[in-house]
Amino acid sequence: MSTTYQLVRNQAALFDFSSEGRFFIKGTDAIEAVNAVIASDLEAIPELKALNTVVLDESGAIQAIVWVLKTEDGIWVLCDPDRHTLLAERLVASAMKCSAEVDDLTEFTMCLAVIGPAAQKIAMAAAGEDVIGIPYLGFEANEQTDTLLCRLGYTGEFEFRFIAANERASDLRAILLEAGAEYGLEIGEVSDLPLLMLEMRSLSQREHIPEGTNPIQAGLHWMVDFQKENYPGHDAVHARKADPGRKALMLQFETVTPPVGDQTVRIDQQDVGRCVCVAFSPTLGKTIALAYVDAALAWVSVVFDVAGLDARAVSAPLFITKTAASPQ
């Protein structure tokens, strides 16, 4: 078990997300400009709320998974580091068609995140008692830390992100580490997050979603507003609802050691899918996997064969986290 895993599941870890893309879209048509790019409907949510959604190409394939934060003055869009250039191009092209302007603030801002069951208490110690009132997908301009404070996350644990100007980096890091000292807060490794996400069936685009996959296949249909019209990939995604081909499915082995070699998923010696990620879950004490299998077989409790081992399809999240089990 890695130190980061233990911290996130039992205490809290501090992560530096500064390499992620951060855009601020402003102007009279800021909502229109962003809405033309994403598959959810930004007009359907109030200010000070966030969306977790996808940007698609015309074939319906996922190009980026993004957070979209709606403020009174404009729209924040956050993305993975390797999607920065692509998203910048899409946002700028959309903004040029209306009265909106895209500010790429990635190089001028930074982001620190506290993740774990103790993260809310740490955020309250650093940013004030009112932080307890921030709901999931909520955020505020926090005066005490001079940051945009967001409650987001994929791990099933509390996650509070602090976005600030670059010059605040050292001070903010010190404030958070001091606030978290009594809770055992330590620096976490971003590379350990995909496993923590997978246990909740939150998907890392880099680790869990092959290029060309659409949201129906990935099980991310909840990131799409199927009542919305006129976004890239609309027709293709609707067509995939009836014929997804293969769909993502969580598998659980009874073994501790992950299977090696061939990751093909089989039933009765017939190839029906493939694992894209296999890992050991310290909390379960078992090996888990994410596989894309023929849609007709993508059902909980079906037992597959992977490298000669039984792999049972299971529902997710795979367990109740300490955050979910604690009084909110």
Listing of model-derived features with the role each one plays in the protein:
Residues 28-29, 80-85, 117-119, 165-170, ...:
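Helix N-cap motif at beta-to-alpha junctions
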Residues 58-61, 212-328:
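Glycine-rich, small/acidic residue-mixed loop/short-helix segments
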Residues 1-56, 60-63:
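Acidic, proline/glycine-enriched N-terminal capping motif
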Residues 99-244, 252, 271:
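Glycine-rich, acidic
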Residues 13-37, 105-122, 244-253:
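Short glycine-/aliphatic-rich beta-strand segments at the starts of folded cytosolic domains
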Residues 7-10, 17, 62-72, 143-158:
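Residues forming anionic-ligand binding surfaces in small-molecule and nucleic-acid pockets
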Residues 45-94:
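Well-ordered mid-protein domain cores that form the structural environment of catalytic cofactors
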Residues 37, 89-94, 126-127, 172-181, ...:
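Short amphipathic alpha-helices in soluble, non-transmembrane regions
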